[in-house]
Amino acid sequence: KVSGKVVKSNQPINFLGSVDKKTGAITDQKHDLFGKKIAGSILVFPNGVGSSVGAYTIYSLKSNNSAPAAMACQKADLTVASGCALANIPLFILSPDEYDNMKDGDEVSLG
């Protein structure tokens, strides 16, 4: 079981190109989470996109103590699934209703 504050995006996340692996900040100016830090959060997003090398970004986030406490998405792609497995970050797959009911800033427990 894992608890934390929801940081929710309605856009897919490219971990390789959009996340600072040292700070956990979203660096893509076009992303709806631009400037937010994901460290310690329950990161809620539709799915991951981009290079499979993004899995190593997720691992680096964990190594730098900048990773989310858990990730929750509607569809687990290979990058997110393998990154979470490498970094030992809980990954939850949400139904459309569960995803819609998650609000940015909510305190939630999953698991």
Kindly label every feature range from the protein language model:
Residues 1-2, 6-111:
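Feature captures the catalytic cores and cofactor-binding loops of soluble hydro-lyases/lyases
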